[in-house]
Design a protein with these regions (language model features):
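Histidine/cysteine-enriched polar flanking segments
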Residues: 3-11, 15, 21-357
Length: 357
């Protein structure tokens, strides 16, 4: 894919500034739908990043075990010293990291899957545990994964709101203040509720005032929004530079749903390939992990990597840090998919446990 990086056009549409970088009142109800066990996240608390290693005993990842371990080592070392971070691994696997990452980040745990973003709590200014029951997994598979996380979560005495709404963490992108983005998959996953009911429930649960519901990318199994968009600042949103007519569908939804933001289109490089039926995520730069002071951006060994890193850096005061995701992106996910973050009291509890152990 050859990109022409010289053409930049600024647009203003219904109060939203859109920079294009060219390449080649709702009904009320009284439903009790959540259990509020969440402690407020303090405004300036430091984020804690959590990564989960694959188990040496897990057959599903057997053929890519070493690649994922190597990626985890690289990612932990790149993030260590910038943000608080821990790496969860079971007893049989933790030895693969000893001497390769700082000892204090290693925590023994039996969380069974690496894609913790999807089944972990969703963190805005509060913390919400959604039902993990995605279309792309069987009920037994999703229950097995979710129960392992819930066991770990409750053992640490962590707190969150709980709801019966089905939503993957990878399908919620929060701007840090009052806006969130998901996809229309949330409507399909929760047919027992109307779209207006879901919108109201999400705004109350997440404590936001505006939500955009993006159309799904063609061929995307997950229906996630976190490979499509990324907030680099609370009022500045990066969006993949899609082809028409999908581009207009995405931009129209963002323009009509979110106020007072700047939208910037960023090149991405679609890569063919399937792994166990999962389309590759290689070339998707917006599946980045954003924290208070850093943006960890995946790179893929592509000629566009350096340009996109510089471009993202030009739109944010946060420091952009590259993370080589070549060892994992072919499995259908990238940097954000493989991390979970929490703040405040829960982060402190996890760090205290890690220090004691």
């Amino acid at each position: 894919m050859k990109l022409d990086y010289t053409r930049i056009i600024g647009l203003v549409v219904v109060g939203i500034s859109i920079t294009v970088i060219f390449g080649t009142m709702l009904p009320q109800n009284d439903m009790d739908y959540s259990e509020n066990l969440s402690e407020p996240i303090t405004e300036n608390s430091n984020p804690l990043i959590v990564i989960v290693a694959p188990s040496i005993h897990e057959k599903y990842y057997k053929e890519v075990f070493q690649e994922v371990i190597d990626y985890d080592v690289m990612a932990v070392n790149a993030m260590y010293g910038k943000d608080d971070i821990i790496l969860l691994a079971d007893k049989a696997t933790i030895g693969y990291f000893e001497g390769r990452v700082p000892d204090e980040v290693l925590v023994t745990s039996n969380v069974v899957d690496i894609w913790i973003r999807d089944f972990g709590t969703v963190n805005t200014t509060t913390e919400v545990k959604f039902e993990y029951r995605p279309q792309y997994l069987s009920v037994s598979e999703s229950d097995w994964i979710d129960e392992s996380y819930e066991d770990w979560f409750s053992a640490r005495e962590l707190t969150s709101k709980k709801t019966d709404l089905i939503l993957d963490g990878g399908n919620l992108v929060f701007n840090g203040q009052d806006k969130a983005i998901t996809s229309v998959r949330v409507f399909a996953d929760n047919p027992q509720y109307s779209q207006d009911e879901i919108d109201q429930m999400l705004k109350e649960l997440l404590e936001v005032t505006e939500i955009a519901y993006l159309p799904e990318e063609e061929g995307d199994i997950t229906g996630h929004s976190d490979g499509m968009v990324m907030w680099v600042e609370y009022d500045r949103l990066l969006v993949n530079e899609y082809k028409e007519p999908f581009r207009t569908q995405v931009l129209t939804e963002l323009e009509e749903s979110l106020s007072d933001i700047e939208i910037i289109e960023i090149p991405y490089v679609f890569q063919e390939g399937l792994w166990k039926g999962w389309p590759s995520a290689c070339g998707y730069y917006l599946n980045s992990l954003v924290t208070e002071n850093y943006i960890y951006v995946p790179v893929y060994g592509l000629e566009e990597d350096e340009y996109v890193l510089e471009l993202i850096q030009s739109y944010t005061n946060k420091e952009v840090v590259s993370i080589n995701a070549e060892d994992v992106c072919f499995m259908g996910g990238s940097v954000r998919c493989l991390t979970w973050t929490t703040d405040g009291t829960d982060a402190n509890k996890i760090l205290e446990f890690a220090e004691q152990n």
